[in-house]
Swiss-Prot record:
Membrane-related topology note: Peripheral membrane protein
Protein's UniProt name: Protein translocase subunit SecA
Localization: Cell inner membrane; Cytoplasm
PANTHER family: CHLOROPLAST PROTEIN-TRANSPORTING ATPASE (PTHR30612:SF0), SECA INNER MEMBRANE COMPONENT OF SEC PROTEIN SECRETION SYSTEM (PTHR30612)
Coiled coil: none
Role summary: Part of the Sec protein translocase complex. Interacts with the SecYEG preprotein conducting channel. Has a central role in coupling the hydrolysis of ATP to the transfer of proteins into and across the cell membrane, serving both as a receptor for the preprotein-SecB complex and as an ATP-driven molecular motor driving the stepwise translocation of polypeptide chains across the membrane.
Catalytic activity: ATP + H2O + cellular proteinSide 1 = ADP + phosphate + cellular proteinSide 2
Pfam families: P-loop_SecA, SEC-C, SecA_DEAD, SecA_PP_bind, SecA_SW
Natural source organism: Jannaschia sp. (strain CCS1)
Matches recorded under InterPro entries: Helicase_ATP-bd, Helicase_C-like, P-loop_NTPase, SEC_C_motif, SecA, SecA_CS, SecA_DEAD, SecA_motor_DEAD
SMART domains recorded: SecA_DEAD, SecA_PP_bind
């Protein structure tokens, strides 16, 4: 019987249905234009892009250009890829353009959908970023969809790790740039550590389309991107402490699996104090509760978490002697990603790996704050409605369910719950054997590498052929996914490994054709293609007759969304399929989040071994438990964002000021304003307002003026003069400091001085910001304890971080003023020494090339294109070039990037 809500929905339609219906007239308009665009030749499509671009630049709204742009893009895709976009794909593209999340089921062609809003927004010339979850997809999509953009007369670029700077800048300068979320975030941080605007890669944050948006903006929201530098080596301490942890008994600590925290009990602390003292780690007479013991306590707690919370082959693997983290949501390895605050080092000690030095944060940003930089943000995923509240609350993004092109034919079974893990796995193996016998391909979803390999062993014992896709086999990922839809295939995958690649019934035709051509290179490729297409059609039909892809999940995830993603691998584009979840009361989710009630009920029912309970209300009960977990995780992310927003406001100020300085030709006025502020603070400190002359610290001010301003004035005599007050003292100090810096500028030359001021200011900003980040990290780690004193930790953090920020700015002004006052031109001897060092560095960098080019010749003739009389060792022969002029050595580089660095 339908409830009132269901009846109302059937009569009036849901809000989502009404939203989709509202754009149907625009889609009809695009369809009406199709014959007109089909009549264009290839040059006509490119000319249409030029026309639309001019109209956009002349102020015509993109919404008004949308029908023509979408019609042009559809025709280009039809010609370049042989794919004609369905109406539902146009609807998805339209909502992306409007800054929404388009929820589109697996196999509905999200990659093609992204080209429509990307093309439309690319007309402005301000750049569009299409964001994917891994480098493979970024490169694949840029090459694949790049054909469409080329047909439209637009440029496409791809950004990837360790890409040469020049190539990266060119990629960002394209109309459409494909990149991973990680690389975009890191490039943003790197750009804000550059020395000049010309060195920056990104050119702004205009419009972004985020593929698998739930994975990036929800799952990874709590993970900050950090650029870090090494700090002191404490590997001996990690190893020493790691030897103590195996001695710890269960009553010495408490473990909270929900929050993944481990803490020592009072009894455990007593045991630790005794053991650490005996081992010589804790100095004699020192207690764990002493302030001096903070570092040791931090390391011991990390070691406990490494042993009791983090499990090998689940959260990480050991490969080539290194601890490599595994993404808990995708099952993929994350090389290069490290846990912070010494936790990674603790795991390295546990596994006996080489301990890498701890790092200090140089710059950081969370995805939550990075993606909020964009003027317009859109996203695509197969599952977003369960997190619609979070998308709306944090990112201001609405979620629109896009209808499928064909009705979903997949059968979704109710969950089967067993008493024990053994019973569950026995049933799974039996079910896989039945499906395999009739030729139905099976995709088995597991939650960890360990469990995927354990299930693999069970299938081997049962003589069932299978493939395993986890972090260890990531190189074969594309091949394994391509074969997963073949007749009788059995594929075990961790969570969502292979996400982003469709599992096609009968296997991936293109892969099969490439393999056949490679196996017989002398044969006619067209003949092979025709033969393979016929064979594939037969195989595809056989798989459909066997029931399509069977997705069999071995556990429920904390998030319903991850479960829905796994389920969505089956039944793409109206194909038949089936999905089942096999659970046990020993599963992590069931155990942690209360399986006691269910266990009692199963006892009451008198269930026998091997029997399962299968009922819709079990599904409802589990979904309620998952919804609770999702709500708790959302609250954590929301609270973390409030803390990060405090730092984000400060980050925007610092990065904004830094960019202004990089873009300014002359910052002499900025340097003078800083110096004047330092002088005012100095006078306030040593000649406090409303005080008499005999209360002034004139000797302290004289010393401060010498140290900070580089000037020596008879300040001690000012106290005896009539009419000298704060204002007069400030004027005298400012005048003397201005004269001193003017004389210094004359020695260096105006252009050189401006360059020095800029470099000193940028370097000092970076140094102070790094120190400030470290201070904020420490504040963040302790401010939670203020709650015990009935004080709001967030308000305390806001207040103190603002005070720390002001203190950082004061320190910045003082340091810049002092550095500029102390800097001196190089003597000829120092210049020669610097030259020798540079020659050594150049030789080391150039290697054999440097030796070959030198060829035993003298300095003068080593530069055949140099200006007349040029001698490398004698700057007086260089002709006084400007920083942006060509270098006099004839290298073709700008002076500032060549010999100008010596100045």
């Amino acid at each position: 019987m339908l409830g009132l809500g269901s009846i109302a929905k059937k009569v009036f339609g849901s809000p989502n249905d009404r939203l989709v219906k509202s754009v149907r007239p625009i889609i009809a308009k695009i369809n009406d234009m199709e014959p007109e665009f089909e009549a264009l030749d290839d040059a006509g499509i490119v000319a249409k892009t030029a026309e639309l671009r001019n109209r956009a630049l002349n102020g015509e709204k993109l919404d008004d250009l949308l029908p023509e742009a979408f019609a042009n893009c559809r025709e280009a895709a039809k010609r370049a890829l042989g794919l004609r976009a369905f109406d539902v794909q146009l609807i998805g593209g339209l909502f992306l353009h409007r800054g929404n999340i388009a929820e589109m089921k697996t196999g509905e062609g999200k990659t093609l959908v992204a080209t429509f809003p990307a093309y439309l927004n690319g007309l402005t010339g301000e750049g569009v970023h299409v964001v994917t979850v891994n480098d493979y997809l970024a490169k694949r999509d840029s090459e694949w969809m790049g054909k469409v953009f080329t047909a439209l007369g637009m440029t496409t670029g791809v950004v990837y790790p360790r890409q040469p700077d020049q190539e990266k800048r060119q990629a960002y300068a394209c109309d459409v740039t494909y990149a991973t979320n990680n690389e975009l975030g890191f490039d943003y941080l790197r750009d804000n550590m550059r020395g000049s605007i010309a060195e920056m890669a990104q050119r702004g944050h205009n419009f972004a389309i985020v593929d698998e948006v739930d994975s990036i903006l929800i799952d990874e929201a709590r993970t900050p991107l950090i650029i870090s530098g090494p700090t002191q080596d404490r590997s001996d301490l990690y190893m020493s402490i790691d030897k103590v942890i195996p001695l710890v008994q269960e009553h010495h600590y408490t473990l909270d699996e929900k929050t993944r925290q481990a803490t020592f009990t009072d009894e455990g602390n007593d045991f630790l104090e005794e053991t650490l003292s005996a081992e010589g780690i804790l100095p004699e007479g020192q207690s764990l509760y002493d302030p001096e013991s903070t570092t040791i306590v931090h390391h011991v707690t990390n070691a406990l978490r490494a042993h009791k919370v983090f499990t090998k082959d689940k959260e990480y693997i050991v490969r080539d002697g290194e601890v490599v983290l595994v993404d808990e949501f995708t099952g993929r390895m994350m090389p290069g990603r490290r846990m912070s605050e010494g936790l990674h080092q603790a795991i390295e000690a546990k596994e006996g790996c080489k301990i890498q030095p701890e790092n200090v944060t140089l710059a950081s940003v969370t995805f939550q704050n990075y993606f909020r930089l964009y003027g317009t943000l859109g996203g695509m995923t197969g599952t977003a409605t369960t997190e619609a509240e979070e998308f709306a609350d944090i990112y201001g993004l609405g979620v629109v369910e896009i209808p499928t092109n064909r009705d979903i034919a997949r059968i979704d079974d109710d969950d089967a719950v067993y008493r024990t893990g053994q019973e569950k796995y026995d049933a799974i193996v039996e079910t896989i054997a039945e499906a395999h016998k009739k030729g139905q391909p099976v995709l088995v979803g597991t939650t960890s590498i360990e469990k995927s390999e354990m299930l693999g062993q069970l299938l081997t014992k049962a003589d069932l052929p299978h493939s395993i896709l986890n972090a260890r086999q990531h190189e074969q990922e594309a091949q394994i996914v391509a074969d997963a839809g073949k007749l009788g295939a059995v594929t075990i995958a961790t969570n969502m490994a292979g996400r982003g690649t469709d599992i096609k019934l009968g296997g991936n035709l293109e892969f099969q054709i490439m393999e056949a051509i490679a196996a017989d290179p002398d044969a006619d490729p067209e003949e092979i293609r025709n033969r393979m297409e016929v064979e594939h059609a037969t195989a595809e039909q056989a798989v459909k007759d066997a029931g399509g892809l069977y997705v069999l999940a071995t556990e429920r995830h904390e998030s319903r969304r991850i479960d829905n993603q796994l389920r969505g691998r089956s039944g793409r584009q109206g194909d038949p399929g089936r999905s089942s979840f096999f659970l046990s009361l020993e599963d992590d989710l069931m155990r942690i989040f209360g399986s006691e009630r269910l266990d009692k009920m199963l006892n009451t029912l008198g269930m026998k071994e091997g029997e399962a309970i299968v009922h819709p209300w079990v599904n409802k009960s589990l979904e309620r438990a998952q919804a609770k977990v999702e709500g708790r995780n959302f609250d954590i992310r929301k609270q973390l964002l409030k803390f990060d927003d405090v730092m984000n406001d400060q980050r925007k100020v610092v990065f904004g000021q830094r960019r202004d300085i990089m873009g300014a030709e002359d910052i002499a006025e900025v340097a003078k304003d800083m110096r004047d502020q330092v002088i005012e603070d100095m006078v306030d400190t040593y000649m406090p307002p409303k005080t008499y002359a005999d209360q002034w610290d004139v000797l302290g001010m004289k010393e401060a003026a010498q140290t900070t301003l580089g000037i020596d004035l008879p300040i001690e005599a000012w106290a005896d003069e009539d009419g000298v007050d704060q204002e007069v003292a400030t004027e005298r100090l400012e005048r003397a400091a201005d004269e001193y810096m003017a004389s210094k500028a004359a020695k260096f030359g105006p252009e050189q001085m401006r360059n020095i001021e800029k470099q000193v200011l940028l370097q000092t900003i970076d140094q102070k910001w790094q120190e400030h980040l470290l201070t904020l990290e420490h504040l963040r780690s302790v401010v939670g304890f203020r709650g015990y004193a009935q004080r709001d930790p967030l308000n305390e953090y806001k207040t103190e971080s603002f005070q720390l920020f002001e203190s950082m700015l004061d320190g910045l002004r003082t340091d810049v003023t002092e550095k500029l006052a102390r800097i001196q031109p190089l003597t000829p001897e120092q210049q020669e020494q610097l030259m020798a060092q540079l020659r050594q560095q150049q030789a080391a960098a150039a290697g054999t090339e440097a030796v070959a080019s030198a060829g035993g010749e003298t300095g003068e003739t080593a530069f055949p294109n140099a200006i007349p009389g040029f001698i490398e060792d004698d700057p007086s022969t260089w002709g006084n070039p400007g920083r942006n002029d060509d270098c006099p050595c004839g290298s073709g580089k700008k002076f500032k990037h060549c010999h100008g660095r010596l100045a």
